[in-house]
From Swiss-Prot:
One GO cellular component, as annotated: cytosol
UniProt keyword annotation of Transcription present: yes
Pfam families: TACO1_YebC_N, Transcrip_reg
Protein name: Probable transcriptional regulatory protein PSPA7_4544
Family indicated by similarity: Belongs to the TACO1 family.
PANTHER family in alphabetical order: TRANSCRIPTIONAL REGULATORY PROTEIN YEBC-RELATED, TRANSLATIONAL ACTIVATOR OF CYTOCHROME C OXIDASE 1
GO annotation (BP), single: regulation of DNA-templated transcription
Keywords: Cytoplasm, DNA-binding, Transcription, Transcription regulation
Length: 248
């Protein structure tokens, strides 16, 4: 299957993400702590924690910081107060948005998310209003230059659902939610370590955006991502390459 990474193009402007590294670390530490609290502090026995550690290392978090976050989850009551919530709504032009948050104060988080939607011309919806448009899947991404045929063979052998070769030569391997850990580990064992591996929400249909709409939608997504309690933001926006280039 070929494509232009339409599912991944919302991960835009990597340099901006790098500039927010402190906030990214805060989100990663929270995930490490809660994962350790729920499933134990040994990554080998805790798939969620194992994935969180991999993501933290990919983000260049030090092993010492990772270990402290895990220890906090195992030995502290702080994580007991954290709950995982999701919000659903629409950005301008009816683009579907799902927000995943981790918080110790439901009211604060709900108010902040609602404010972001309202300020950016969107609408916060009810549970189920857009979730039916998405499917939770695993996504393992490889930069251009990987051996396409060998990776495809290894991915299908490992039980992947789909392998997408993007126009720029990068490759995305998609799995079911249940098979994500086993496929990712099988690929790593076969010599294919993804540049990024995560559980994500893949839209069943996408909305192609022009420049003006893309600017409005990304403004909302950026505002949501900047909220301390928000862990992930997903949308069904498909931003064409020429529009993405104009966004800078």
């Amino acid at each position: 299957m070929a494509g232009h990474s339409k599912w991944a193009n919302i991960k835009h402007r990597k340099e901006r993400q790098d500039a927010k590294k402190g906030k990214i670390f805060t989100k990663l530490i929270r995930e490490l702590t809660v994962a350790a609290k729920q499933g134990g502090g040994v990554p080998a026995d805790n798939p969620r924690l194992r994935l969180a550690v991999d993501k933290a290392l990919t983000a260049n978090m030090t092993r010492d910081t990772i270990d402290r976050a895990i220890a906090r989850g195992v030995g502290s009551n702080d994580a007991d107060n954290m709950v995982e919530l999701s919000y659903e709504g629409y950005a301008p032009s009816g683009v579907a948005i799902i927000v995943e948050a981790m918080t110790d104060n439901r009211n604060r988080t709900a108010a902040e998310v609602r404010h972001a939607f309202s300020k950016c011309g969107g609408n916060l919806g009810t549970d189920g209003s857009v979730a039916y448009m998405f499917e939770r899947k695993g996504q393992i991404s490889f930069a251009p230059g990987v051996d396409e045929e060998a990776l495809m063979d290894a991915a299908l052998e490992a039980g992947a659902d789909d392998v997408v070769v993007n126009d720029d030569g990068s490759i995305d391997v998609f799995t079911t939610f249940a098979d994500f850990i086993s496929v990712n580990e099988a690929l790593t064992a076969a010599g294919f370590k993804g540049d990024e591996a995560e559980v994500t929400m893949i839209p069943s249909t996408t909305a192609t955006l022009d420049l003006e709409t893309a600017q409005k939608v990304l403004k909302l997504i950026d505002m949501l991502e900047d909220l301390d309690d928000v862990q992930n933001v997903y949308s069904n926006a498909d931003i064409p390459d020429d529009v993405m280039a104009q966004l800078g």
